[in-house]
A protein has these predicted regions:
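C-terminal beta-strand-loop-alpha-helix "lid" module of Rossmann-like NAD(P)-dependent dehydrogenases
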Residues: 173-220
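Substrate-binding pocket helix/loop in short-chain dehydrogenase/reductase
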Residues: 95-97, 104-106
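Active-site helix of classical SDR
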Residues: 120, 155
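Residue(s) in the substrate-gating loop at a strand-loop-helix junction
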Residues: 139
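Conserved glycine-rich Rossmann-like NAD(P)H-binding loop of the short-chain dehydrogenase/reductase
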Residues: 26-42
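The beta1-alpha1 cofactor-binding region of Rossmann-like NAD(H)/NADP(H)-dependent oxidoreductases
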Residues: 58-69, 102
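Conserved glycine-rich cofactor-binding loop
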Residues: 12-14
Length: 284
């Protein structure tokens, strides 16, 4: 039997890199995409060292025609596309809505929301054909806002809303969907230098606000730190293997505790999913 073809976005670092390598080791044919050519070369070396094969391809998810072209090419070359992990989108602009420029908001939304949406739209015809799996990584901040994460939370809320609305519809055509909601994960995006590049701020005269990175680093330190990125790959593989995966999945107890007050008794999204299915059923 031919191996299942899995497309993973954002594989040049962090969770995407771990997911791609772990999936290849588990027997998937993995198409690993990213937009940093130097790091893609490093990923190829790491795959070779681990004795796994990756089909590594350049992809800038904000280039929507390129997204459609690449996903179409993947389906043609491999003959099918069985699963997509759309997880590129760790773009931050720390600060309040007052501080972050309008261009800063657009910059964050363009990658975190519109880029992932382009991947989903391009992949769905192929996933319907294979009755495949769609996993979309958002964040615990896609359900619960957090101070100084205004733009990031907005982008993740938007993605959560789109995928939550989509999931019960595409399920009727054989596509099973899961929204993955990590808390802080030990990736490069959590490094201070990464944030400093993305502090797209308007000047606030006599600003009462603390320095955003200092605030965030203290919060992370007081909540038990970050999740090891190596924990995420096996969790994604488990979700891909489930016959009836949940609509929602939090990768760590911290994330579950963080979103629980808002989700109450529906942590895995089953109740909202069933309500949506009933709503669809009203149309006959």
């Amino acid at each position: 039997m031919a191996s299942k073809v899995l497309l993973v976005t954002g594989t040049t670092s962090g969770m995407g890199r771990t997911i791609a390598l772990d999936a290849a080791a588990a027997g998937y044919t993995v198409v690993a995409t990213g937009r940093d050519e130097q790091r893609m070369a490093e990923l190829a070396k790491e795959a070779k060292a681990r004795q796994v094969e990756l089909d590594i391809r350049f992809l800038e998810i904000t280039d929507h025609p390129a997204v459609y072209a690449l996903i179409g090419a993947v389906a043609r070359i491999h003959g099918h596309l069985d699963a997509v992990v759309s997880q590129a989108g760790g773009i931050f602009a720390l600060g309040t809505a007052e501080q972050i420029t309008m261009d800063g908001f657009r910059f964050v939304l363009e990658t975190n929301f519109f880029g992932n949406l382009a991947v989903i739209k391009a992949a769905l015809p192929h996933l319907r054909a294979s009755k495949g799996r769609l996993i979309v990584t958002t964040s615990a901040n896609g359900l619960v806002g957090a101070p100084y994460n205004d733009a990031y939370a907005a982008s993740k809320f938007a993605l959560e809303g789109a995928v939550e609305s989509l999931a019960p519809v595409v399920a009727r055509y054989g596509v099973r969907t899961t929204i993955v909601e990590p808390g802080p994960v030990a990736t490069e995006v959590m490094a201070p230098r990464r944030f400093e590049k993305l502090l797209l701020h308007d000047a606030v005269e006599n600003s009462p606000y603390p320095e955003p990175w200092d605030f965030l680093s203290r919060v992370i330190g007081n909540t038990g730190g970050v999740q090891a990125v190596e924990e995420v790959g096996p969790q994604i593989l488990d979700l891909l293997a489930r016959d009836n995966p949940p609509l929602r999945f939090q990768t760590a107890q911290w994330a579950r505790d963080f979103v629980a007050p808002k989700l109450s008794a529906d942590l895995d999204g089953k109740k909202v999913y069933e309500a949506s299915e009933a709503y669809i059923g009203l149309a006959g």
